[in-house]
Amino acid sequence: MKSILIDAGPLIALFNKSDQYHSTAVNFLQDYSGGLLTTWAVVTETSHMLSFSTSVQIDFLKWIQRGGLKLAELDSSHIDRLITLSQQFSDVPMDLADASLIVTSENYKIGEIASIDSDFYIYRNIRNQFLVNIFPR
């Protein structure tokens, strides 16, 4: 099964019914038949943005537990690359979650992402390629 990366924006929208992208996120995930891959940094960012409700945060974690998405394996061996990316794109700027998604795209050879952010058209992976954003905005 083909997988794409997913950023915090669509995940926040999926679990926050008052988010302007909520219905877009729901429809996107209903129509998308592939796998979703993200990082712990994205999960942390999403959970923080859902802090208006502990029950919504728990619903998000249960959704992951049920297989809503898979978590990429990043470890301390990736820190050099995270630093390099953060320095390279410091003018954008690139946060840890975004850098972790670029590193994941390199490690898992994934070229597509679902994101609300336009920054992924600026960021480049180690092969100087940007991620194609397939989330409708």
Regions found by a protein language model. Give the residues of each.
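Conserved glycosyltransferase catalytic-site signature
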Residues: 8, 98-99
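PIN-domain endoribonuclease scaffold, especially VapC-family toxins
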Residues: 2-4, 23-93, 103, 107-111, ...
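A secondary-structure boundary/capping signal
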Residues: 7-8, 39, 116
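Low-complexity, intrinsically disordered Gly/Pro/Thr-rich segments
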Residues: 117-121
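Metal-dependent nucleic-acid phosphoesterase active-site entry motif
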Residues: 1-19
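Activation segment
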Residues: 14-15, 114, 124
